[in-house]
Amino acid sequence: MPGWQALRAELHDKGLEIVTIGLDAGGADAVRPWIEAANPEHPSLIDETHIVDELFGVTNVPNAVWIDEHGMIVRPAEPANIEHSPLQDMEIPDGLPERIHDMLVEVKEIRDDSEAYRAAIVDWVENGADSPYALSPDAVVARSLPRGRDESEAAACFELGRHLHDAGDDDGAVTWWREAHRLDPNNWTYKRQAWSLASTAPGEPSDLMQGPTDLYEGNWLDDVKASGGGANYYPSFQP
């Protein structure tokens, strides 16, 4: 979040606006502390239903969609890191619990395209439609993730789970969220939402480790390993 605030401050006078969206079924209570800590000058929204998944093809965070001054999408949802994570440079200390050690190993392997991605945004702001990073409508469609039957059913299952969760039926929510995970196993936002709700104690901040529970077959670390490790967690930036 600080990186996006800094980028906005740098380029807002040239026409750039940043809108951040927190995906969290916990709503304002879950997201507000993060927004208040960042104290952003740009709009910060909350998406309790993960509607941006459904509308724009978001499957992980952070993702971004570029929309020009005419309201046209010029880059579809894609990984959107603009700051190098210090975790990737840290030396992993000895004596850590095995699971935390293994998680840090995978985090250090996550692809870092932050410098190139930030430079692409700056180029777009400077050059508009002439920027090589502003895609044609056909290219936007070609790069957008397909929405097949399984992905559509997964979106419906996730929404059913969220409705039951809001109604206090946690067991019912888990059933439908498990089905969403089965139908769309590459959607990390569905998984991470369910895992964090399952592993976060009442009244505590969201559990970012999203470790194993009895409710779901997967968890962050094991699913990352199963997908080929941290290097495959985000697809590479495609100019």
Segments (PLM) and residue ranges:
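Non-globular targeting/processing and membrane-anchoring segments
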Residues: 83-239
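C-type cytochrome heme c attachment motif
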Residues: 2, 19, 54, 60-63, ...
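Short, internal strand/loop/helix patches
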Residues: 32-61, 65-67
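Sec-exported extracytoplasmic/periplasmic mature domains
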Residues: 9-13, 36, 57, 72, ...
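Residue-level detector of anion-binding/catalytic polar loops
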Residues: 17, 41-43, 186
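Short, thiol/selenol-centered motifs that function as redox-active sites or metal-ligating centers
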Residues: 1-7, 71, 150, 187
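Short, glycine-anchored, charge-dense loop/turn motifs used at functional sites
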Residues: 65-87
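Structural microenvironment flanking redox-active thiols in thiol-disulfide oxidoreductases
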Residues: 1-37, 48-49
